[in-house]
Amino acid sequence: MKDTSRPVTVARTVLLVLGVVDVVRGVMHTFVLTWAAENIAQIAPHPDALMLLGLFGNSNLLTGALFLLVAFKAREIAGYILGIIPVAYFVGIVGIRLNGVSMQSEFTGKYMMLVYFVVCIVTFVYFVVAGRRKSKHN
């Protein structure tokens, strides 16, 4: 039987929305690459940058599909997935910084990603805290 408790439902819904967001990001990074680079990320459309952006689009399509799959087939773990997302990106950012790489472009997508991470963290904390309260009352 599927868990329909409020924390699970909230986490599932947020993961579902993020899945759709990632699919849209994947389509933009993969199929409208130059337009997205110039108009959204505001980075120079250098061929190497576009190649990396396109490859990142592939991973966006993958994560979007996996988030949707979890939301529909394994809703009980949706909250944990939301906790893993910012940790994975943080590890990636640490690796980038350790290699001395820094952005030179405006990269306006960072504001959307900040909201993305805050939503993940707030929902994960709610999922864990509400889940613990529920288990104490049972």
Segments and roles (model prediction):
Residues 64-80:
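Juxtamembrane helix-break-helix junctions at the cytosolic face
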Residues 117-138:
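Membrane-water interface at the C-terminal end of transmembrane alpha helices
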